[in-house]
From Swiss-Prot:
GO terms for molecular function: tryptophan synthase activity. Belongs to the TrpA family. The lineage of its organism: Bacteria, Pseudomonadati, Pseudomonadota, Alphaproteobacteria, Rhodobacterales. InterPro entries: Aldolase_TIM, RibuloseP-bd_barrel, Trp_synthase_alpha_AS, Trp_synthase_suA. This is Tryptophan synthase alpha chain. PROSITE patterns: TRP_SYNTHASE_ALPHA. PANTHER family: TRYPTOPHAN SYNTHASE ALPHA CHAIN, CHLOROPLASTIC, TRYPTOPHAN SYNTHASE, ALPHA CHAIN. The alpha subunit is responsible for the aldol cleavage of indoleglycerol phosphate to indole and glyceraldehyde 3-phosphate. Pathway: Amino-acid biosynthesis; L-tryptophan biosynthesis; L-tryptophan from chorismate: step 5/5.
């Protein structure tokens, strides 16, 4: 049982949906992003997705791409991201943390070294957007052997022939990308997403979380209501990019979380 598994079990017992929040590590600097991260649980966040900045973020929209650039320009590295997690864990041992990003920084560090450091720091799961199931031996299987969940993305183009392969070694939860394209690109509609979520849930016992295109508490409520929860990223990262005070960012997160929890 991981912290992610425990969180979903608790939420089910409470009759609540999960609210997952994404932030970019080191955006705009280490101090600010750590302050936001530390405030997320009190704002109602059930699971934290922590973005690893990367120089070529092909799946990210302009908001998150720019956040990654700000973080890299501010000196953020994988080492400093792991330091962020350790600092957070010194105060919070309960809230799950999923690192999300691309394979290159992990490969450059060495898979075995990275997994040892990630588990020691207190990471619970990984989302690596550019590693397909055919490459599971590279990272997915070693990560699971190290006790980490490996969370896979399913999309509107993941057909019934492809879905079993996607789900085969997935653990923790399934992240359903509700729209085709890059992050933050459009608004997701529950009426369009519901049949796809039902199709995935028919194929797995894992929780299904909906992400991409959620910007308001109302949308969070609608989309969490047809799944096991929802993820908000670009809408939060945008506030950080605008230089809003940490307290204002967290107030907005709390409103989004309340929407999801009202589902």
């Amino acid at each position: 049982m991981t912290r992610i598994d425990d969180t979903f079990r608790r939420l089910r017992a409470e009759g609540k949906k999960a609210f997952v929040a994404y932030i970019m590590a080191g955006d705009p600097d280490l101090e600010t992003s750590l302050a936001v991260m530390r405030g997320l649980p009190e704002a109602g966040v059930d699971i934290i997705e922590l973005g690893m900045p990367f120089t070529d973020p092909m799946a990210d929209g302009p908001t998150i791409q720019t956040a990654g650039q700000r973080a890299l320009e501010g000196g953020q590295t994988l080492t400093r991201t792991l330091e962020m997690v350790r600092a957070f864990r010194a105060e919070n041992a309960e809230t799950p943390i999923v690192m999300m990003g691309y394979y290159n920084p992990i490969y450059a560090r060495g898979v075995e070294t990275f997994l040892a450091e990630a588990t020691e720091a207190g990471i619970d799961g990984l989302i690596v957007v550019d590693l397909p199931p055919e490459e599971d031996a590279e990272l997915c299987l070693p990560a699971q052997a190290a006790g980490l969940n490996f969370i896979r993305l399913a999309t509107p183009t993941t057909d019934s022939r492809r879905l079993p392969k996607v789900l085969q070694n997935t653990s923790g939860f399934v992240y359903y990308v509700s729209i085709t394209g890059i992050t933050g690109a459009a608004a997701a509609q529950a009426v369009d997403v519901a049949p796809e979520v039902a199709r995935i849930k028919a194929a797995t016992d894992l929780p299904v979380i909906v992400g991409f295109g959620i910007t308001t508490p109302e949308a969070a409520q609608d989309l969490a209501g047809i799944a096991d929860g929802c993820v908000v990223g670009s809408a939060i990262v945008k506030l950080v990019g605008e230089g809003r005070p940490v307290a204002e960012v967290l107030d907005r997160v709390a409103a989004l979380a309340a929407g999801a929890h009202a589902a």
